[in-house]
Amino acid sequence: MHLKSNFKNINIIIALDFFDENKAMKFIYNLNPTIYALKIGNIMFTLFGVRFIKILQKLGFKIFLDLKFYDIPNTIFGAIQAVANLNIWMVSIHISGGIQMLKSARLALKPFKNKPLLMGVTILTSLDKTDMSKLGIQISLSKYILSLAKIAHKCNLDGIICSGTEISNIKKHINVKNFKILTPGIRLNGCSSNDQKNVTTPMLAKQYNVDYIIIGRIVTSSQNPLKTLELIRSQI
């Protein structure tokens, strides 16, 4: 049975990382596509491909294809056009791929009337300052993320994907009126952060005024997923 809501805009994206398609569909059939969008990442896309995406679209769900594209500009151009041909709602691309790659991604969407939202990945929520230092990045995490956000804005991406803790700093330096912010790593108080080092609660996400939040394991691994979703929605 679908959940009822007065929400006009989808602002919750549920991350599907199932290895079993039947288990995924059992979970999905309880969701209302007018409330929730679905995120398909590397696991499910590799296992079930475009066929699975089309099944979800027929059910009315908007799809965020989270493959975090990162390649040379020419390859990205073709990949993003392929995504657009699938009527995908949102797609992710690594900002660190560079200005030319990002411009190529934007140019690839020019012929399309219904363009997917092009969202730039800043850094993975599993990384912290120590990890970045080992990669040779010596400036602070906040400065690095802000630098990437500015590049994404300059290249006319539709928005960025970043930790909630960085949003206030980004909003001080970038006009985010038409620039979407998506925050992953959402956890309820008391829940394990698993492998994510930069997590945000639903209440904080509301305070940060983000446009979209990604909910994953705290729901899909819950003994009562619908009750957990209702709790999250009550906090935003």
From Swiss-Prot:
Q: Does the keyword Heme apply?
A: no
Listed under catalytic activity are: orotidine 5'-phosphate + H(+) = UMP + CO2
Enumerate the GO terms in the molecular function aspect. Answer: orotidine-5'-phosphate decarboxylase activity
Q: Which residues form a coiled coil?
A: none
What name does this protein carry?
Answer: Orotidine 5'-phosphate decarboxylase
Task: State what this protein does.
Answer: Catalyzes the decarboxylation of orotidine 5'-monophosphate (OMP) to uridine 5'-monophosphate (UMP).
One GO cellular component term of this record is: cytosol
Q: State the family it belongs to.
A: Belongs to the OMP decarboxylase family. Type 1 subfamily.
Task: Check the record and name the Pfam families matching this protein.
Answer: OMPdecase
The positions annotated for binding substrate are: 17, 39, 66-75, 125, 187, 196, 216-217
